Structure formats: structure tokens, C-alpha cells
Amino acid sequence: MVQLLLRYGRRHPLYAGLLLACAAVVSLPLWASQKSKTQAVPEQWEMSLDGGRKLTWEHSFSSEQEVKPNRSFWNKLADVIAGAPDYHSLVRPYSVVSDSHGRIIVTDPGAAGVHIFDFAQHKYKFIQRWGKSRDSMLAPQCVAVDAQDNIYVTDSTAGVIFVFEPNGKFVHAIGSLKGGEGYFKRPTGIAVDSAAHQIYVTDTLRDEVFVLDMQGNILKTIGKTGDGNGEFNLPTELRLVGPNLMVVDALNFRVQVFDRSGAFLYSVGKLGDSPGAMFRPKGIAADSEGDLYVVDGLWGMVQVFNQQGQLLYYFGSSGTHAGEFQLPAGLFIDHNDQVLIVDSFNRRVQVFHYAGLKQPVREGAQ
């Protein structure tokens, strides 16, 4: 190997670099090529529930690199010479959804963009809108998809809803008027009812839920400022579940449930530190049996309620391991009961699977 370096190194520096890299691999000490006896065991987490139900942690992800197929030896060798490629990573993720093809879409206010993870096809895309005179993406918050997998993203700072095609191509912005002013103060939660051709959006500062047509025209609003039934104090996330609309009423420390016309039905939660109480409710979703999952960002846990508002169980604690959270935020459950939870401060999305009784899916069109 030394003779080869002396012979070719001066005339062919690139060859010299490759030879050096190969030499480094070949000359590794014996202990480095053996598996460590103290090798970390893959993390596991599982919760057994009544009636044979089970909630299982599957994996977590945080960067583009985890979507890509395993790199070959020659790719890794090239990385030694030229440097490893730069991969996009989650910075301050907030909201999550998955589309009909299983792609996972994550908003990231910290990166001022939206990540699309396609594990099935080993593809990744990052959506940004910078340097636009109008409709620049500044602080993407919540995300939803329609029946055609078009992507809808609220931006709480820009005060608009960005609409993208499934491939990430920008379509238009909703809520921005010609003069630059808009009718949203701080749009946050969003859900799309494709069958009714309607979009539901919470405006946190207006204490209202806007109901729009697909062109962005206002059809009606739901709610007003207050702490009574049908009134809000900084509403944030929302979700369509079967015939109902569920809204996180953050500073009233509850989730309110309406029918889709806006008529109040009931509420879940209250301020407190006992099971069933809420302190900082964030993401919400429902599984195939209609049970309601509510993230509490401050407590680092998820509480699960039945359709009568009774607490069934809760899971999670503060930490960095499987099933542990630091400032969890968005939550989404797909039609296969895959549970996606944004673990914001840990800069990752944790993936669980709920094995229940497999009743018909109650989740509304997103």
C-alpha cells in the first residue's frame, strides 16, 4: 500500500486520497471490526390496554437521511473523500399529517418550511417560499391534506393558508388580499372536508373558527371570545371526526365538540393537575374506534378519552427515549391507526401503532 502511494500519489492526488481511505478501513484494529458486547439494544415501548388492545412504539425519525436507502460502500468511501452530503433535519417541528400514499408531512416553523417524508419510495422533499413580495412562508403552523392529497398549511405570521400540489408546487394563498392585508389575524388549526368542499380554520387571536369554501371565500364563523359553551379563549388545533368538529380551546383548558354546522355538543377537559385535566392542550386526533387523543405540551403526555368524554388512559412522560416527550405538539392518526406525534423539543416525530377492535374509521376527510 505504501509503495502504491509513493508511486501514484504525486501524479494522481485523487488516487492517493482513495488509497488512504482504503488503508484506513483495512488497517482498523481488530476490536473496531467486532461488535461491541455493550452494543445498545433497540428501544422498545408498549402499553397493554383493556380488551386486548395494545399501543406499540414503532420508531422515530428526524431527518431526510432516515428516508434514503442505505448507502453503498462506494458512496460511503466517497463521503470520506468529498465529505458527507448535507441532509435536511427537523428544527422545531409542530404539526403532522399523512396523505393517502402514506407520505408524512411535517410543518417546521424553525426551518420556515414543510418536510415531506416518503418512506415507501425513499424520497424526501422540503417546501419553502422565500423572498416573495407577498405570500412568503414565515412560520408554518398546522397542515392538512384533501382527498387529492393537496397540502394546506397555515402560517400564523404571514396570516394566510398556503396551498400546494402533492408534489410541493405552490398553487395559491388563501386569506391574503390585494393590498397585502388579510382577514386572518393568526390562522392556526386547519382541516379540509373534501366531500363538502369546505375548509375549517381556527384564528387564534380572533377566537373564531372560519368555515371557507375551497376558493377561500368565508361561508361563516363559529364561536366568539369567552369561556362559555361555544366560546373560545385562544383556540388552536382542530380536527374533523365523523360528523363532528373538535377544537382545542387552549386557555379554557379544554376541547370543545361541535357538529359541522357549528352547534355546540359537549366539551372535554378542565384546568387542573389530575388525570383528565389539561394544562397546555395541543394536537388532537381520533382512532378508528372514535376515542379522542389530546396532547398536553407542558406535561409531555397524551390523554385518551372515549366519546362520552371519560378518560380511558394516558401515556408519555418527560424525556428523550421511546414514548417520552419534550414539548410535544401535533398529532395525527391515519386510517390504519398509525399514531404520529410531533416531539418538538426533541426534534423528531414518534410513530406508534394502536391495535384495537378495528371498528370503522371515524376520522373525517383531511
What are these regions (language model features)?
Residues 3, 24-27, 242:
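N-terminal non-cleavable signal-anchor helices
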Residues 15-27:
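Bacterial N-terminal signal peptides
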Residues 6, 29-30:
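N-terminal regions of proteins, emphasizing targeting and processing segments when present
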Residues 2-18:
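Bacterial N-terminal signal peptides that target proteins for export
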Residues 31-366:
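Eukaryotic scaffold repeat domains enriched in small/polar residues
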